[in-house]
């Protein structure tokens, strides 16, 4: 697998237009690959006043066209193999993490007990609880108070094939420290992501080893 980073030039008109729609960004990401429609993860990250797009994929991407239209021409894009990171993951190892996700919940109907409509987790308490409940399933744990919500945003856009229907996604950013409890499950999480909206910039968890 490969992790790719490209700086977006927000001074360019084309880039500002791109950022108005998650569907447009999804199209740009898909255009960087020649293969079939594999699952790819991506997200936007702000760092030091600059905006980057991260892309995690099985196939090595070609973002040259994207750089010409939306990127920083001097920086281009950087692709690194993901396997060296995966081989460093061991049981009980600790990592700083950042996750951008779409936390949701399904409330059962009192009258029937059937699963109800899926809704975004509205408050920070619900959003933190969503991640806490899923940690074990994905092979990690977090100490109480060991993570926090650092960002909340809404994205409303139209899918290219469904222009008559809008899509609303709540984006929640988490940061903290985790401990790996199941190496294989955790590696799968890193490669496949978590939650809904993964085609539209959600679900990618990145880690950095604690000193």
Positions of the model-derived regions?
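RNA-interacting cores
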Residues: 1-211
């Amino acid at each position: 697998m490969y992790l790719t980073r490209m700086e977006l030039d927000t001074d360019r008109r084309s880039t500002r237009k791109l950022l108005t729609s998650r569907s447009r960004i999804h199209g740009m990401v898909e255009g960087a690959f020649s293969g079939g429609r594999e699952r790819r993860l991506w997200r936007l990250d702000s760092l030091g006043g600059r905006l980057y797009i991260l892309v995690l994929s099985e196939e090595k991407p070609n973002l040259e066209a994207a750089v010409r239209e939306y990127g920083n021409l001097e920086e281009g894009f950087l692709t690194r193999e993901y396997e060296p990171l995966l081989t460093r993951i061991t049981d009980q190892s600790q990592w700083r993490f950042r996750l951008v996700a779409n936390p949701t919940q399904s409330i059962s109907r009192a009258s029937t007990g059937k699963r109800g409509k899926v809704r975004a987790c509205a408050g920070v308490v619900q959003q933190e609880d969503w991640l806490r409940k899923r940690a074990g399933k994905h092979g990690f744990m977090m100490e109480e108070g060991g993570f926090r919500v650092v960002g909340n945003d809404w994205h409303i856009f139209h899918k290219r094939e469904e222009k008559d229907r809008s899509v609303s996604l709540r984006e929640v950013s988490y940061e903290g420290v985790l401990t790996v409890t199941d190496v294989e499950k955790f590696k799968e999480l890193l490669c496949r992501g978590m939650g809904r909206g993964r085609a539209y910039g959600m679900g990618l968890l990145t880690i950095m080893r604690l000193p």
